[in-house]
Amino acid sequence: MEKDQIFILKDRGIIYISGEDAKEFLQNIVTNDINKVSDTSSCFASLLTPQGKYLFDFIIIRHKQGYFVDCEKNQIDQLIDRLNIYKLNSKIEILNLSNEFEVAVISKEKFLALENAKDIVGNTVKYNGDPVALDPRSKNLGGRLIANLE
């Protein structure tokens, strides 16, 4: 990857989960500790069946009063359906924001040039109000920018 290039990932979609119970809801259903997710730290997680079989994987990034879920665009409807099954009486809202946000990738070097960026897996900063996270799977994968299309 050229260090100054930005690549739009057309195969990625964005779900936004917000509401009073959003943190507890995610903590109870995904494979990573949501308590570690903050304005400065993101995580990689999966959703499994009750029997422990893999269903989906995604990156969770804190944004405003909720969480962005960066997932495969072709699975977004199935993931939202599954999340709604687990929603029950939780005070949350689950929105497909794929038409309003794009996922882009920048080089690790470009990420580290951003203000307050650290060379730590999952480190998250803001750029023009949009979150940019050093990929929580491996920092060598670069930064992931969730950019508002407006």
Give residue spans per PLM region.
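Basic, glycine/lysine-rich polyanion-binding surfaces/domains
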Residues: 1-150
